[in-house]
């Protein structure tokens, strides 16, 4: 076993005298399938209940059980909830990774470890705490088969005592976690209390990190992005969901099933929705298109491999002009890639998904709140413009826990777009399905079952004229494609506008100085790293930046204006090939493209502020 400056008696010396309050990253290293998820959630929630802003990130393997898992809790008094690169307090429960985990820490960090691991001989610039977990759990859990699961709750109690997390909040979190299982709650509470008592009696506090009560989480909730998206889709009026299970999107539909069963049952006791597990992703999007053609609000959820399989039907929906919503919870590719790691690698593929000339609307949420609100926006846009709308989430947002204000009840009415009724057809005497009467590229449609002889039309993915009749005439094809492009251009005025933060006052879209020469463009969950990085750049290097967060494609006028106003614009994204930057170049005047710079992050971990700060400051010559 390699060593680094062996510590006398493994005590960690006199480290940690500086008191660091409500600013730390706690990492729990365990084995997948060991029951640590409940313990980690309890620890996260206990800190949250003490009024301290938190976020939780689960780094787990793509197997059922047995491989290493890391769960990171960030607590930050200033409200930074992006990933912190440095680990301040390590709970080492996995013998396989313990040595590497310890050796990767910065000096001054604390390590809580299972006594048999003997980690305190590795380094003398860390604070070590040894705990006999098996001995402690045996005193509170008579059933040996349960000890493996309850053992994790012991470290919750130990951490609570060492960081001064109130045990009353730990109990509340346990009661909430096991709300329907009183016996399990009592057993886990006993384990946590035993850990707390052991730490109080046997461990001398030497670390620097503390949790103290604040008042920055009052009225807030903790929820993952997939659950927020499922709730948003239900409120948006979605009635047909078709899917094929794939990580990390499966939990979106699984949660939606539970919501719909509870809230979308009619007075007669029958479901007012249909959720179908298809045989594959191609079948799933085919059902979405069929339901959308029939007038239902329909959707599917998938990830990159599913997006690839959906390509042919995506082209059909684009060309035949049928509405539908697709949630892409992005993960690392290509191919199978890293199924349980996060990415923003589907941007280019999705924007032009299918062969031929296609362009798709993309909405890009950065928060659980936007997962909820963009669901309604996606369905409205899909029906208004009779096309697919892709909501580009990612694993970090979809599967991790985020702090948020409660969602506001939707008040925006459902927008069905240009749908002709029997009465409309009576007045018109007929209609041409793909004729651009209003100059916006959007034709009028009818729904199956409309009782009028002029209502029917033939839906096809082959060449057609404005009356939907089959045609191979060059002018019909060219006119149709130009109209589709005109429709896409019209959407620029309807998609969510970007969020712009200027100058020193990052909280106001109208604040700041016009003299700032450096701009940053980012999107999705990269936002949380950028918020923190801008403060680091200002405080450490004197670099002032303006920031634009993209929320949709196609780009609006504000995006062009932002680039024009800055000498250098850094496009930060979580993929190798600068995919969003490539989209921007296609959209910009050639002379503006030279202002763009790329900062790429592609290791599968959520973007952290320090990585952005280091790279941007270096590129600026600092």
PLM-predicted stretches and their roles:
Residues 2-236, 240-242:
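Active-site cofactor/cluster-binding pocket
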Residues 13, 20-102, 240, 247-352, ...:
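Thiamine diphosphate
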Residues 13-15, 53, 72, 76, ...:
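Metallocofactor- and cofactor-centric catalytic cores in central/energy metabolism, strongly enriched
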Residues 23, 178, 204-218, 233-238, ...:
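Gly-rich Lys/Arg/Thr-decorated short loops/hinges at beta-loop-alpha junctions or inter-strand turns
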Residues 42-46, 106-108, 122, 256-260, ...:
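Short, solvent-exposed amphipathic alpha-helical segments in soluble enzyme
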Residues 61-64, 118-121, 136, 250, ...:
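Short gly/pro/ser/thr-enriched loop/turn and capping motifs at secondary-structure boundaries
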Residues 105-111, 125-126, 273, 322, ...:
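A short helix->loop->beta-strand "cap" motif at the edges of active sites that frequently abuts
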Residues 222-230, 234-236, 374, 379-622:
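Flexible, low-complexity linker and terminal segments
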